[in-house]
């Protein structure tokens, strides 16, 4: 998993994860986007 410092408030992390790891897979944990390659 790849934890980012991008805050997420009930929104999707897909766009963030697509930028970070190239795959729109992730979820919001403790207010941060965590991406799963």
From Swiss-Prot:
Residues with Pyrrolidone carboxylic acid modification: 1
Sequence intervals crossing the membrane: none
Keyword match Nucleotide-binding: no
GO MF annotation: an example: toxin activity
InterPro entries: Scorpion_toxin-like_sf, Scorpion_toxinS_K_inh
Tissues of expression: Expressed by the venom gland.
Cellular component aspect of the GO annotation: extracellular region
Keywords: Disulfide bond, Ion channel impairing toxin, Neurotoxin, Potassium channel impairing toxin, Pyrrolidone carboxylic acid, Secreted, Toxin, Voltage-gated potassium channel impairing toxin
UniProt site positions, description: Hot spot basic residue in hERG blocking currents: 6, 18-19
Domain of life, source organism: Eukaryota
UniProt keyword annotation of Secreted present: yes
Annotated S-S bridges: 8-28, 13-33, 17-35
Family note: Belongs to the short scorpion toxin superfamily. Potassium channel inhibitor family. Alpha-KTx 15 subfamily.
Role noted for this protein: Blocker of voltage-gated potassium channels (600 nM of the toxin induces a block of 25% of hERG currents). May also inhibit Kv4/KCND when coexpressed with DPP6 or DPP10. In adult rat brain, it blocks the transient potassium channels in cerebellum granular cells. Blocks potassium channels by a simple 'plugging mechanism', in which a single toxin molecule finds a specific receptor site in the external vestibule of the potassium channel and thereby occludes the outer entry to the potassium conducting pore.
Domain notes: Has the structural arrangement of an alpha-helix connected to a beta-sheet by disulfide bonds (CSalpha/beta).
Protein name per the record: Potassium channel toxin alpha-KTx 15.1
Organism: Androctonus australis
